Amino acid sequence: MNKWHFHIPRLSDLLPDVSGLSLNDYRYLCTMQFPSTLLENAVNEFAKLPGIGKKTALRMVLHLLKQDIGEVTHFSETIAKMRSDIKFCQRCYNISDADICSICANSMRNQRMICVVENIRDVIAIENTQQFSGTYHVLGGIISPLDGVGPDQLNIEQLVTRIEKEQTEELVFALSPNIQGDTTIYYIQKKIQKLPCKVTTIARGIAFGGELEYADEMTLARSLAKRLPVEQYMSH
């Protein structure tokens, strides 16, 4: 038996973790020299944000260095307070400063109409159109078996209970027009088909496979205004 054992490291063991970095950012990372470890650590943290590369992160950090210490402290405290104190509405699961969000608490909104969306970004997108006067229900995702997301991981049962309890008159689906979105619509429709609730969906002004949050306000407003019965939508 050979008593000599040599460990030959893999190339990946010798390189830094560059997952998620573009080729340009990787090259920049390899050549970037930091005069301060504190500066480098701050840049690395900013670069973890979506859509922020190393160059942009460096510009942000250098901008903060130019600011008064009081402004930087206020900035960091605002972010920390948002993360620690923000809540999710107990009724619709939108983000909120209180147990019930400002939309659900607004008596001027149509409390008998619910717009079902995938995430909070979709709520913001629809609100920016100023064309919807009802309330929302945030599912927290869409059914996607390939991603391990089933109905039990979403706020679907809470939606069914809410429709029954609040005697909802119209349920508007505003989910992204893709296979996962259509699967989610079909599943929920079957769950509530015996309830006296009109079920509609936004018109297909958004290209199939697209995402709701990236639609421009005019297209989204038109899709809301021309919503159609879900049976008609699913038959296309």
Kindly give the residue locations of the regions a language model identified.
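Short, positively charged and aromatic/hydrophobic N-terminal segments
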Residues: 23, 28-31
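Cys/His-rich Zn2+-binding cysteine-cluster or related metal-binding knuckle/ribbon modules and their
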Residues: 33-40, 48, 58-123, 236
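Basic, flexible Lys/Arg- and Gly-enriched helix-loop patches that mediate nucleic-acid binding at interfaces
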Residues: 89-92, 103-105, 132-134, 138-161
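Acidic beta-strand-to-loop metal/phosphate-binding motif
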Residues: 113, 117-118, 168-180
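Short Gly/Thr/Asp-enriched flexible loops that form oxyanion-binding sites at enzyme active sites
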Residues: 180-193
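Conserved phosphate-handling catalytic cores of large alpha/beta enzymes
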Residues: 196-200, 211-236
